Amino acid sequence: MPSTVAPVKGPDHFLNLVFPERVFASYMSPLAQKHPKAALYIASLAGFIFGLLKLITFPVLCAAGLFVFPIKGIISSLCHRRLDACSGYMLATFLSLFSLALIIVGIVSCVAWAPEFIFPIISIGMALATTETCFQIYTHLFPALEHKPSSPLKIENTTTKLSRSSSAPDLSCPSLSTQPTSPNQSLSAYKKY
């Protein structure tokens, strides 16, 4: 019996490590469907708190990914007895290495910048981290519903309704008449006002 679950790719491994709240949100999705308002309040609060902590946890989790992903890749390839099972983990390892290198370059380059420039950059980074954390929580807490295509008959009825409503005159304006008029009648209508 084939599995219907989509395989987890390398970027998903990386994002699941760096944003652990998205894994938790996907587990809590059925409960969030029952209580959407409470879930939104909790998700907003969690996104704000975790977003502020992202400036500290992001580099730490990227460094942890340099050790965790190769080990998971080796174990996965040994369990499945094929080498392509570890390709997602290798990509996640390179993403962790690249992210950590960008963070180190950013910190080293901040030494040469003026404090008036560094503090707004930190503020923008915190805002982006909070926004991304809220986005990750929300998209995994409330997954998109599958859209079923409607029948051609319903689409045809909808388009005919739209064409009828767009060609109808605006009856709220008293100067517009619903009957076709001659040029003399239209001039007499303007003379009244």
Curated annotation (Swiss-Prot):
Pfam families: DUF5422. GO terms for cellular component: plasma membrane. Keywords: Cell membrane, Membrane, Transmembrane, Transmembrane helix. It is found in: Cell membrane. Residues 158-193 are annotated as: Disordered. InterPro entries: DUF5422. The chain crosses the membrane at residues 40-56, 63-79, 86-110, 117-138. It comes from the Bacteria. It is a multi-pass membrane protein. Belongs to the chlamydial CPn_0442/CT_006/TC_0274 family. This is Uncharacterized protein TC_0274.
